[in-house]
């Protein structure tokens, strides 16, 4: 019988399951895993909360596994205020966009570092935009910020629109939702101090993610608006 192997993990989401169990979605380097935690009200159940660095052993070959062991591996990333809402936003992105049981070790590493940075109180917007971009890239949805859809260099004085299925397209007529070339070039260099860069990055990532997230609103985004 195959023995479970411990792996690092974070809880993305959990809910009550039957009388004393919980259905838990974990994020691990091996992907998003769903498992049943028996006796969820016991001492181990106190670890079933977001942003706690864990080591878990999961049993089972199907999509719904069982937690055979779960231990904390360090100090939790205590998030408060807007940092907490930001962390919940990251979790919701992973829940909505990651296919089940598909390995994404690079995203896992970047997620861990982003949680640490949020806990340290670093500026939120650059952290969120960087994570969104890395997520799009790892999922195969990224596009060039240096070249347009016709393989021409992004011009600082140009205007561009995002074609989600292809990339950035230069346009001549002013219309809603466009991006200035100088802003796109700043984003390509992760120059968050450039005028307009953070706002442009937020608009660009929202447009890029929308088609993959679908019509259902993000709960974390609504919570952030109502804070």
UniProtKB/Swiss-Prot annotation:
Keywords: DNA damage, DNA recombination, DNA repair
Keyword check for DNA damage: yes
Superkingdom per UniProt: Bacteria
Gene Ontology cellular-component terms listed: bacterial nucleoid
Listed transmembrane segments: none
Keyword field contains Amino-acid biosynthesis: no
Gene Ontology biological process terms from the UniProt entry: DNA recombination; double-strand break repair
Stored Pfam families: RecO_C, RecO_N
Record HAMAP family: RecO (MF_00201)
Stored PANTHER family: DNA REPAIR PROTEIN RECO
Functional note: Involved in DNA repair and RecF pathway recombination.
Homology family: Belongs to the RecO family.
NCBIfam families cross-referenced by the UniProt entry: reco (TIGR00613)
Protein name: DNA repair protein RecO
Organism: Pseudomonas putida (strain ATCC 47054 / DSM 6125 / CFBP 8728 / NCIMB 11950 / KT2440)
